[in-house]
């Protein structure tokens, strides 16, 4: 995020903790890279996809925007985005394969999953670019990330409830995503506290509401995953 504030010299207070912020950025990248790698592995093993289609399109569109159109000047951020974008293309291919099986009850979707993913990604991509043109890439980066996170957390929770099955998900998938996102909250908090002239808006009511919503949704996901997993274990023991 500080990679989009090159016109502003960081204050001395922030420079002292920048190493910590960059460490959390790397932690964010590590968590999401593990999550993406596991999603690819699950997809290629024929398991259902664990990310709903719209959040998937939105994620890859956001990464396209801030890797290619508005690249960050922060090398750590840019490297994380580039790796995530590369892995997301493989995830997209895996999602297309999974959709043929998971959505076989809906031929319109299962037979045209690739086209739907492409159109969805282009729509989200143009939306992220338009937002950056409207309010500037620094703000759009953050608000776009908020939308991505909420769509993913809430979409994932309802996907788990709708399936009532652990197929396509695991504790490692959930925890890597959750910890990666918590690292995002941590480095954003450091920037807000030690560079308030640029990032003070991160303490706004809407951002705080988004933070609470994310924490509630992802915590609920963990609780529901435990309940579903426990029910599956009991069912297997009966048989």
Swiss-Prot record:
<dbReference type="Pfam" id="PF25129">
    <property type="entry name" value="Pyr4-TMTC"/>
</dbReference>
<feature type="transmembrane region" description="Helical">
    <location>
        <begin position="50"/>
        <end position="70"/>
    </location>
</feature>
<dbReference type="GO" id="GO:0016829">
    <property type="term" value="F:lyase activity"/>
</dbReference>
<feature type="transmembrane region" description="Helical">
    <location>
        <begin position="75"/>
        <end position="95"/>
    </location>
</feature>
<feature type="glycosylation site" description="N-linked (GlcNAc...) asparagine">
    <location>
        <position position="164"/>
    </location>
</feature>
<keyword id="KW-1133">Transmembrane helix</keyword>
<keyword id="KW-0325">Glycoprotein</keyword>
<keyword id="KW-0456">Lyase</keyword>
<dbReference type="InterPro" id="IPR039020">
    <property type="entry name" value="PaxB-like"/>
</dbReference>
<comment type="similarity">
    <text>Belongs to the paxB family.</text>
</comment>
<keyword id="KW-0472">Membrane</keyword>
<feature type="transmembrane region" description="Helical">
    <location>
        <begin position="20"/>
        <end position="40"/>
    </location>
</feature>
<dbReference type="GO" id="GO:0016020">
    <property type="term" value="C:membrane"/>
</dbReference>
<comment type="pathway">
    <text>Secondary metabolite biosynthesis.</text>
</comment>
<feature type="transmembrane region" description="Helical">
    <location>
        <begin position="138"/>
        <end position="158"/>
    </location>
</feature>
<protein>
    <recommendedName>
        <fullName>Terpene cyclase idtB</fullName>
        <ecNumber>4.2.3.-</ecNumber>
    </recommendedName>
</protein>
<feature type="transmembrane region" description="Helical">
    <location>
        <begin position="113"/>
        <end position="133"/>
    </location>
</feature>
<comment type="function">
    <text>Terpene cyclase; part of the gene cluster that mediates the biosynthesis of paspalitrems, indole-diterpene (IDT) mycotoxins that are potent tremorgens in mammals. The geranylgeranyl diphosphate (GGPP) synthase idtG is proposed to catalyze the first step in IDT biosynthesis via catalysis of a series of iterative condensations of isopentenyl diphosphate (IPP) with dimethylallyl diphosphate (DMAPP), geranyl diphosphate (GPP), and farnesyl diphosphate (FPP), to form GGPP. Condensation of indole-3-glycerol phosphate with GGPP by the prenyltransferase idtC then forms 3-geranylgeranylindole (3-GGI).</text>
</comment>
<keyword id="KW-0812">Transmembrane</keyword>
<feature type="transmembrane region" description="Helical">
    <location>
        <begin position="197"/>
        <end position="217"/>
    </location>
</feature>
